[in-house]
Swiss-Prot record:
Protein name as annotated: Large ribosomal subunit protein uL22
GO-annotated molecular function: rRNA binding; structural constituent of ribosome
SUPFAM superfamilies, sorted: Ribosomal protein L22
Biological process per Gene Ontology, one example term: translation
Family named by the database record: Belongs to the universal ribosomal protein uL22 family.
Cellular compartments per GO CC: cytosolic large ribosomal subunit
Keywords, in A-Z order: Ribonucleoprotein, Ribosomal protein, RNA-binding, rRNA-binding
Keyword Ribonucleoprotein on entry: yes
Amino acid sequence: MEAKAIARHVRVTPRKARRMVDLIRGKKATEAITILKFAPQDASTPVLKVLQSAIANARVKADKAGEPFRENDLYIKETYVDEGVTLKRFRARAQGRAARINKRTSHITVVVASKEGDR
């Protein structure tokens, strides 16, 4: 059984979010939660939220199907970060000039699956 969660337009740069996603790819869901909770990077918070949402989605899916739900059997099957919309801002510079500031956003996707059927 698979469950998926997507967070769109998250205000973290894709490059920084990919660092966090690379840490947890292929790991058990409970282990990934521990890694993200203790990671010092700010990008770990939105990735953790998406992972928790995917686990909750798996719980709901299992309840609907009448299957027993075991969080320890879940692992991260697939996870990736896509680039979202870039917000363009300007900062005033000397002699009437302006410099562009790009505020990048990300779309974070996490897919969790249970071990017995997929691995």
